[in-house]
């Protein structure tokens, strides 16, 4: 019975310690992934100017070997005017590049099918609704017209209450000018 745990221990240690015999090239795989990431990042950003260091690591290490070559980057600028320090700080968003290539009419708003159905239904309703008028008739705009019931329920003009004086003034004394302006604003 003691032989089984010892054999398992021996096989486990052999598998664990003997793993270095199978040569796994992890470093080259990591290097490939890192290079791929760096190239894709280089495509997105403009080249950083080499005239001044941008980070603390570059100051201490001095000039370092770059992972990205200019011929690797497809969209690299070959124009010497754009490689100045001002151009290094500009980043271009991806969607703007694709939007500039689109020359069709640009319509803003909802483009879903449900929105199209709603817009169509609204247009049909507007074209077929001949009963309603877009403008209120003159009789409704006059002071005796629209909202006349509400106006009847208000107190008389001389007995108006203001925010500062909630009680009506005795004898219908005129309110100061500031109170009259405030009352006119509240009427609207």
Curated annotation (Swiss-Prot):
It is found in: Secreted. GO terms for molecular function: adrenomedullin receptor binding; hormone activity. The modification Tyrosine amide is found at residue 146. Disulfide bonds join 110-115. The modification Arginine amide is found at residue 41. Residues 45-92, 153-188 form a propeptide. Residues 131-176 are annotated as: Disordered. The record marks 116, 125 as: Required for CALCRL receptor interaction. Transmembrane segments: none annotated. One of its GO terms (cellular component) is extracellular space. InterPro entries: Adrenomedullin-reg_peptide, Calcitonin/adrenomedullin, Pro-ADM. Belongs to the adrenomedullin family. Numerous actions have been reported most related to the physiologic control of fluid and electrolyte homeostasis. This is Pro-adrenomedullin. It comes from Canis lupus familiaris (Dog). The lineage of its organism: Eukaryota, Metazoa, Chordata, Craniata, Vertebrata. The gene is ADM.
């Amino acid at each position: 019975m003691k032989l089984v745990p010892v054999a398992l221990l021996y096989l486990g240690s052999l598998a664990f310690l003997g793993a270095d015999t199978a040569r796994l090239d992890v470093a080259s795989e990591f290097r490939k992934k890192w290079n791929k990431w760096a190239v894709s990042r280089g495509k997105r950003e403009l080249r950083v100017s080499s005239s001044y260091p941008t980070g603390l690591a570059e100051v201490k290490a001095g000039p370092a070997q770059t992972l990205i070559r200019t011929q690797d980057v497809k969209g690299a600028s070959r124009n010497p005017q754009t490689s100045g320090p001002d151009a290094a700080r500009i980043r271009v968003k991806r969607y703007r590049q694709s939007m500039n290539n689109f020359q069709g009419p640009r319509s803003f708003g909802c483009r879903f099918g449900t929105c199209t159905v709603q817009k169509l239904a609204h247009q049909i309703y507007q074209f077929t609704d001949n009963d309603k008028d877009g403008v209120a008739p003159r009789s409704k705009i006059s002071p005796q017209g629209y909202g006349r019931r509400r106006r009847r329920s208000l107190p008389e003009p001389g007995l108006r209450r203001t925010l500062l004086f909630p009680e009506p003034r005795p004898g219908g004394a005129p309110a100061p000018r500031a109170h009259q302006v405030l009352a006119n604003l509240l009427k609207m």
